[in-house]
């Protein structure tokens, strides 16, 4: 990975994550509680997810976000050391995070209004697109899809762990 890619793409990821999750942490719990009924009526199949999110308080959310931030910081530092497969590991996490930003935009469209995280998703979408394009240009299609799949699977597993951890503390 070039020095400019590290400077413009790798190093900002933890900060972008912090800013995005700060928006979510500030409004998530109150927003879900105040929109729970409307969400359940509009999306009845998502009732278990809505109930789960209703039970995650701000403290639990912040603990979960801190765990995720540690993962991103470790991956970012690993890139800086030039470790084996560090670029692929970081790229997988970046692809998953970029998908997460895109999901917020889709949620806002489906909800037809504000959802927690959508403002920073809009602000950071150019960064995500730049990163996706940079990764796309430096890998094969198969590697790109494999990193995306690994990143998404890791994100799902880690999110479950992070939420569990947040509820325990």
Give the location of each predicted region.
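Transmembrane alpha-helical segments that form the membrane-embedded catalytic/substrate-channel core
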Residues: 18-25, 97-108, 152-168
């Amino acid at each position: 990975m070039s020095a400019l890619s590290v400077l413009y793409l790798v190093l900002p990821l933890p900060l972008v994550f912090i800013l995005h999750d700060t928006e979510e942490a500030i409004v998530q719990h109150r927003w879900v509680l105040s929109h729970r009924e409307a969400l359940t009526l509009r999306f009845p199949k998502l009732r278990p997810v809505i109930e789960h999110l209703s039970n995650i308080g701000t403290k639990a959310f912040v603990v979960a976000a801190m765990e995720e931030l540690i993962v991103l910081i470790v991956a970012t530092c690993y890139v800086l050391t030039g470790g084996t497969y560090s670029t692929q590991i970081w790229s997988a996490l970046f692809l998953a995070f970029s998908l997460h930003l895109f999901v917020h935009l889709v949620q806002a469209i489906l909800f037809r209004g504000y959802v927690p995280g959508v403002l920073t998703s809009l602000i950071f979408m150019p960064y995500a697109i730049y990163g996706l394009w940079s990764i796309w240009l430096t890998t094969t299609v198969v590697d790109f899809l494999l990193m995306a799949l690994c990143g998404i699977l890791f994100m799902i597993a880690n999110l479950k762990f992070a939420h569990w951890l947040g509820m325990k503390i």
